[in-house]
Amino acid sequence: ARPIHTGCLFEVADDSITVVAVDGYRLALRRWKAESPIGRTLKFVVPAAALKEAEKILGDTDETCTFFLGSKHILFTIGEATLVCRLLEGEFLDWRRVLPQNQPIKLAVNVAKMTDSIERVGLIISEKLKSPVRCRFGENTADFRSVSTIGEAHDVCQIAGDGQDMEIGFNCRYLLDALRAIPDSECSLELVNGLSPIVMNPCDGSGRYSYMVLPVRLKAGE
């Protein structure tokens, strides 16, 4: 990965803050309203390690996080704690070109139930046994299967919508990471075909988050 992509892109415009993280296989986006309007547009990249430190501090308090941006550094204040780090330099991925919009197949899913189903079929998959999860989206059902040297696993989850019997493969951990990050009880799964990314968005269309995961090409017998 390019050094710039070890950080998170912040885009600040008016009263909106958008944060984007990417690697070679997935993209995560979260968007919030700022408590006070910024009044101008800002774009900068903060190292992920610094954000993890800020998250640890925020986890112990209800304090508001305030940041002050310099030309090469950013300063976070959280209650009585202060964190300063150097910004990353370089050209961040143009995420607007990468993140699909208006995918034709939209399925409403219960996040907890789908997470449970994928966790169950993922029990026979490990870092050494990197078999994909084979997902088949039908009419109001999602069928998940996995095969490894340990054995086979199968689970079914109820969904709302018609997936047109589409079959698509994913890295189990990447799919679970996205589902576990969703703050809602339900989300919208959006797809095009078996070789295109899956995107998870809010059912209300608010754009508060988007999680994109690239598929794994399935082989016969997997």
Where do the PLM segments sit?
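DNA polymerase processivity clamps
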Residues: 1-31, 37-88, 102-222
